[in-house]
Amino acid sequence: MRLQGAIFVLLPHLGPILVWLFTRDHMSGWCEGPRMLSWCPFYKVLLLVQTAIYSVVGYASYLVWKDLGGGLGWPLALPLGLYAVQLTISWTVLVLFFTVHNPGLALLHLLLLYGLVVSTALIWHPINKLAALLLLPYLAWLTVTSALTYHLWRDSLCPVHQPQPTEKSD
């Protein structure tokens, strides 16, 4: 993999890094503690999975770029333009969830993102089948994050659904 490949692999990580740098003072553990779902993975697991998925998706975009001749030509506009839009939406979800604390709006963006990733896979498939297949783990991950976000949104609307802390008996 050439230098361009490394750039494509690293590019998806730029958004989360910038979001963290500019909003770290506003982030809090608002979705932890009693709000934490029993089936939600630990924060470090979420971070590792997200990092791996961003790297795989970045590599897939490199394969498409390479197969379309590289450069910045017109054939790249739709496949990589759609990819750029989905990256932007993905980064927006981070802001909505972790800094604005709006799981409802984050959920809407996640559903939009899901549709964009499916569209990207369909457009990439004739160009590079492997690139399209590499988006499947991303779709699976979006399913998990959408379910988590849905539950947090539902619990914020209806307190009766919120998980109650269990009392430990001595």
Curated annotation (Swiss-Prot):
Tissue: Expressed in erythrocytes (at protein level).
Domain of life: Eukaryota
Biological process according to GO: 5-aminolevulinic acid import across plasma membrane; enucleate erythrocyte differentiation; import across plasma membrane; intracellular cholesterol transport; lipid droplet organization
Record keywords: Cell membrane, Endoplasmic reticulum, Membrane, Receptor, Transmembrane, Transmembrane helix, Transport
Location, primary (coarse class): endoplasmic reticulum
Entry-linked InterPro entries: TspO/MBR-related_sf (IPR038330), TspO_MBR (IPR004307)
Residue stretches spanning the membrane: 3-23, 45-65, 78-98, 104-124, 130-150
Gene Ontology MF, one: cholesterol binding
Compartments, as annotated in UniProt: Endoplasmic reticulum membrane; Cell membrane
Coiled-coil region: none
Membrane-topology descriptor: Multi-pass membrane protein
Pfam families assigned to the protein according to its UniProt record, in alphabetical order: TspO_MBR
GO cellular component terms listed in the entry, alphabetical order: endoplasmic reticulum; endoplasmic reticulum membrane; mitochondrial outer membrane; organelle membrane; plasma membrane
Subunit composition and interactions: Homotetramer. May also form homodimer.
Note on domains (UniProt): The C-terminal region mediates cholesterol-binding.
Functional description taken from the UniProt entry: Cholesterol-binding protein involved in the redistribution of cholesterol from lipid droplets to the endoplasmic reticulum. Required to meet cholesterol demands during erythropoietic differentiation. May play a role in transport processes at the plasma membrane of erythrocytes, including regulating VDAC-mediated ATP export, and import of the heme precursors protoporphyrin IX and 5-aminolevulinic acid.
Family: Belongs to the TspO/BZRP family.
Protein name: Translocator protein 2
Species for this entry: Homo sapiens
Gene coding for it: TSPO2
